[in-house]
Amino acid sequence: MRKAIEFIQSKNNIGFVSAGNTGAVTALSKILLGTLENIKRPAFCSMIPTLKGFCIMLDLGANKESNENHLLQFSIMGHAFAKIKNISNPKVAILNI
């Protein structure tokens, strides 16, 4: 896993698939790749298809408990991802199951 993440770090690849431990992949990614400024907790992200295109969802089961600071950080990461996808005015919402 470390070699795969280092390969991403060297800009030779943009992602990888692992059958390894999710916690290990997440921890190594945070250590080697870093996070956005002021982001303390990484979150899994997926693009979910909708009738109007797609929805970007973060923290898809990665954290058992999240406080208000974590939710704010998730919204910052979602907004950054939306900018990459050229979404100029993204809506941010909370879904709790």
Language-model features: locations:
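Anion-binding alpha/beta catalytic cores of soluble intermediary-metabolism enzymes, centered on
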Residues: E6-S10, G15, A19-I97
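Short, structured active-site "lid" loops
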Residues: M1
